[in-house]
Design a protein with these regions (language model features):
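A contiguous pocket-lining binding segment that forms or flanks enzyme active sites
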Residues: 145-149
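Conserved "HGTGT" condensation-loop signature of ketosynthase/thiolase-family condensing enzymes
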Residues: 1-135, 142
Length: 149
């Protein structure tokens, strides 16, 4: 069996209070957070209407994917992609289960649209104008490793 090798050409990062890789490395080095950081990323790949409609998990996925492409100087429209999530969007899953159990006719069409596991991959291909292969994967504790494979 031969060893697998990989190269990281670009990194994207986002979490509350640390909106990019530079902020994250500065925090790790100095313990200082930026004075201002957005509460939620605003993925520039999406039109304003789609940006408002996209759930937070999709906004983060698109923000970090685009940042990684920019850091690698790669055009996102030309790249196949893998979006990996341990649980998907739990807030939407919880909403869907509760609403279907209590008042099925009240399900929001937008939330229903975003309840699928491949929502981030779909928004990515539309926003980036990418016609390359896009995959969404979930493997619980093995999600990160499976996403790399």
């Amino acid at each position: 069996m031969s060893a697998l090798t990989a190269t990281i050409a670009g990194i994207g990062f986002w979490t509350d209070g640390l909106p990019d890789w530079d902020a994250a490395t500065a925090f790790a080095r100095d313990g200082v957070r930026p004075d201002t950081a957005p509460a939620r990323p605003a993925p520039q790949l999406l039109a304003p209407n789609e940006r408002r409609r996209a759930p937070g998990s999709v906004a983060v996925a698109l923000e970090v994917a685009l940042a990684a492409c920019r850091a690698a100087d790669r055009d996102p429209a030309t790249l196949p992609s893998v979006f990996a999530s341990t649980h998907g969007d739990l807030a939407i899953t919880d909403y869907m289960c509760e609403t279907l159990a209590t008042d099925p006719t009240a399900v929001s069409p937008t939330k229903f649209h975003n309840s699928v596991h491949n929502a981030a991959a779909g928004y990515w291909t539309i926003g980036a104008g990418c016609t390359e292969a896009a995959t969404a994967i979930s493997a619980f504790d093995g999600t990160f490793a499976q996403g790399l494979l």
